[in-house]
Amino acid sequence: MKKHLPLLSLLTGALLITNFLIAQKADKFVYAVTDINKQGPNWSYLRKIDLNTGAYSDVLLNGADINFRAYSATTRKQFEAPLTDVRYGTAVNAAFATGVAALAYDKKNNRLYYTPMFIDQLRYIDLKTMKVYYLNEMAFTGKPQKSADQGNIVTRMVIASDGYGYAMTNDATQLIRFTTGKKLEITDLGTIVDDQANKGVSVHNSCSSFGGDIIADDEGGLYIFSARNHVFKVNLETKVATHLGVISGLPNGFTVNGAAVDADNKIIVGSAMAATSYFTVDHKTLAATPYKIAGTVWTSSDLANGNLLATANRPKGSTIDLIARQEEATDGKIAIFPNPVTNNQFAVQFNELSAGTYTIQVTDVMGRQMVQQVVALGGSKQVQTIKLNPSAAKGFYLVKVIDQENKAVYSTKILVQ
């Protein structure tokens, strides 16, 4: 990041408001999907691992209970009668029916999003109430019939730095994006493409690249960790997957089935097959070292927390804080477009903010203040075009809007590409 961020131009006398990504303490836990039995293959029980101690919690949710009564994600009301499915009957009522291998933690809303392996549906757990919501009016992949080779089963999911959830099928022919706010929307982004430099290791190959998990970094990228321990980096803009290599140091029989970023910016990985230990992986070298679990080590089909892998360039010697997501406000008072920002400019639309004086604080991801601007806002429905200096560094910028009472009224993030 440059020492000084060029001042952003203001037009029409309105307010500069952009987006906000805040660096704060990393999550020191991961959620894990396990069986009720230590080595069991039924991925229907939710636990939490304390990364400070390596200890598992008791079962937080019994996802195998077919008498479970969930809620509609659309109406927010509890289903009045048990659900039925032509293939699975009333077993579809169980929160983790048919098992779960794709889980993502939404830090802002304190939710766990997931999809059952053989039920084409997005679901989420409200961790404040432990109520479970099913989006049963909308297909997740559009392919309810799962193929014999399990290529169209979703086994990877994460909340990325842009605040969207992303899920991927085993064969990487579908990258699914979903919103995480009040209104859930699902978009099929299409197939992942192999980088020409991959030297024959395809992201679509079942022998090398199926299964596993995905994590997100702080520059808008995704990392695939396959069950065969291969690692790919995915550019979300181009959907190109670049093969980075194979994890070294894992014992024979260890398959990566869950991955999450820990407080030291290492990737903790767990296995559904070999539960003698968890491991941490250095994303630069792909070398694995054992991670000690206290007490019983459970096999796990997936892991999730809210940490992003810190990969952005930072000043030498600076402390790395993992990036915690803080998504765009959803009250409609302010809208920003486009985001990610292209051509070094974007528009800010003010819909319902009261007239008055506001202070804009712009900081980088290290928390250093770059700009403080006081602006008078005259009314609603004002649109402000913001032009960035073409020489401004690419990446995230952090912005907070403070009112006359020194209260933050809006915060979000932009990614400048």
Describe each region flagged by the PLM.
Residues 24-26, 105-109, 159-162, 216-219, ...:
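Residue-level detector of Asp-centered blade-edge/turn motifs that repeat once per structural unit
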Residues 321-351, 363-368, 415-417:
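Surface-exposed, proline-anchored Ser/Thr-rich loop/turn motifs
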Residues 272-319:
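Blade-level signature of beta-propeller repeat domains, shared across WD40, Kelch, NHL, RCC1
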Residues 27-34, 111-115, 164-168, 221-225, ...:
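Conserved beta-propeller blade signature
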Residues 56-86, 133-141, 185-201, 242-248, ...:
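Beta-propeller fold detector
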Residues 376-406:
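Short, surface-exposed loop/turn motifs with a glycine/proline- and acidic-biased composition
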Residues 66-74, 95-104, 142-158, 198-214, ...:
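Repeated scaffold domains used in trafficking and secretory/extracellular systems
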Residues 3-5, 396-417:
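C-terminal tail/sorting-segment detector
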